[in-house]
């Protein structure tokens, strides 16, 4: 992609502490992004709450803030530094949530900060469970029966509509599935859904039919602003659905699928990243 001369200063959000859902790969990708931006002549402002990372080394960025990764802090730093653009895609779920909130509350527009990489529409489509399902349906991707809910009454009605147990609860805009789980009865459903609604930034959970025991695959897909896309890596979880992918044993590349199966899944992954309009790297679970 050509260099943009209208941008002078770019703020990069780190991912914070290493934990399930945000592991060391975000430190590596963030470090590479900072180096690439500086090599292209941009001034880089890095904000990260974890001092024990490569990207926080003094020589990495022009300006480094070791501050909490929360919207109020990022907004305050933007008011001080006045960056031209914000790059959140290298900071994982935490950074994407911050960027989405700052865009929705008007802070980015008020401060004249452009969200680069994946835009707000792409973030919302990937993180909002209802919007994501609509995108999948629009391009003909098969999905399990699922209903997006914003209240406990809707959760109970959705469970009745699905009509079988167990039921999966998936909160929107949370890190590593925080607040989600599998409910085997009504009591567990109420308990997990209450936690999920509380942890979701938009108070939304997806009530989904069970796919426990199914095989889980992961496709790392990269796409640029000119719509060039490629599969970087394929991975196969040894443990079935029901074991958190952060705790599952994973092998790369796919081991038990034929090339014909891989080509079908590859095409679906590429169609999805294009439909979501994601620019950068995306991990697609299948």
Sequence positions of predicted segments:
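N-terminal beta-alpha lobe that positions the nucleotide/phosphoryl donor
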Residues: 1-283
């Amino acid at each position: 992609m050509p260099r943009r001369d209208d941008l002078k200063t770019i703020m990069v959000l780190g991912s914070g502490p290493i934990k399930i859902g945000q592991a060391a790969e975000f430190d590596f990708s963030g470090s590479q992004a900072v180096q690439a931006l500086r090599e292209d002549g941009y001034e880089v402002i890095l904000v990260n709450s974890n001092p024990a990372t490569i990207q926080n080394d003094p020589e990495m960025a022009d300006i480094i803030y070791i501050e909490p990764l929360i919207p109020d802090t990022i907004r305050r730093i933007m008011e001080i530094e006045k960056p031209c653009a914000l790059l959140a895609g290298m900071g994982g779920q935490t950074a994407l949530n911050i960027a989405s909130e700052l865009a929705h509350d008007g802070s980015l527009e008020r401060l004249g900060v452009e969200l680069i990489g994946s835009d707000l529409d792409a973030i919302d489509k990937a993180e909002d469970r209802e919007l994501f399902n609509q995108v999948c349906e629009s391009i003909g991707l098969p999905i399990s029966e699922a209903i997006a809910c914003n209240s406990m009454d809707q959760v109970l009605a959705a469970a009745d509509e699905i009509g079988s147990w167990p039921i999966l609860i998936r909160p929107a805009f949370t890190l590593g599935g925080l607040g989600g789980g599998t409910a085997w009865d009504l009591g567990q459903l109420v308990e997990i859904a209450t936690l999920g609604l509380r942890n979701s930034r938009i108070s939304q959970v997806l009530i989904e039919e069970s796919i426990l025991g199914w095989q889980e695959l992961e496709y790392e897909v990269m796409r640029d602003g000119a719509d060039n896309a490629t599969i970087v890596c394929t991975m196969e979880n040894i443990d079935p659905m029901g074991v958190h992918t952060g705790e599952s044993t994973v092998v790369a590349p796919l081991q038990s699928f034929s090339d014909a199966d891989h080509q079908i899944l590859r095409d679906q992954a590429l169609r999805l990243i294009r439909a979501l309009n994601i620019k950068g790297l995306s991990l697609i679970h299948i």
